[in-house]
Amino acid sequence: MRFKPFLAVVWLLLLTQQASSAIAQPTVNSIVPRSCMPGATTRVTITGKGFADPIRVATNRIDAKLDVVAVEAEKVTMDVTLPDSVPLGPFGIWLASAAGPSEPIIVMADDLPPVSEAAGNVAIESAQAVSTLVSVDGSSKGPQGSFFKIDVVENQRVAFEVVTQAIESKMDPVVRLMDADGNILVLADDDEIGPDCRFSYQFDTPGTYWIEVRDNRYTAGLAYQFRIGDFPILRHAFPLAVTAGEKTSIGFGGVDQTQAIVQEIEFPKSFANKVTTVATRI
């Protein structure tokens, strides 16, 4: 069921490709923002090449609504509307012209408000001020780091996560959390399940703190999603497979497994042999 819209686009393209071979297929360079909130419409801008009008869009998230607002040669503007009940996590969007489809564009359904990374945030002195509830669309800067700063109250717990694998980025992130004196409170690198960084910190002292995000191999231009919030730090869900049409309790393993709320889910029988995500909170 979830792939029917895309297959219909491919079928149409196969019928028309021979007559349109001189037109380049769409190629995507960037998407801003890279995350969309449930229960809202997000205006998304995609840049690249070969965006000939008319252009079609498709997604593997069957409950998402995509509306093309404007098409230019190197930019497509669209509105992405997600229902309140959408599962949090990555999903794909495809653009298709008469010449063929683009590679999939990975977008995150995220309940944290999206913010774009500011230009020039390459030092503590020029760090970008962000909220403790935010999802930042970022890009690695080679030998330089991206610096952010947050203000916290006494005994506030804040969770941090740099997402790369889910958005199919090749970045290998390293994160440093620092206090006003430059002391490193946390140095986060790979965890047990991959290169993404996830940790939480309980701030005993109120004030301003700084976070640096950089690529471990000093490569520039690699995408990442920097999430700051009050979410649990988890590694996996269990069981990993459920029976469609039956209610199942989903538990979680990881640092905050004892605090994470067990989720009861039931997928329709038509959802058999599909993959999805399950979100939880403390």
Predicted regions, residues:
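N-terminal secretory signal peptides that target proteins for export/translocation
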Residues: 1-3
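Acidic, Ser/Thr/Pro-rich low-complexity intrinsically disordered segments
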Residues: 25-75, 84, 98, 138-282
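Bacterial N-terminal signal peptides
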Residues: 7-18
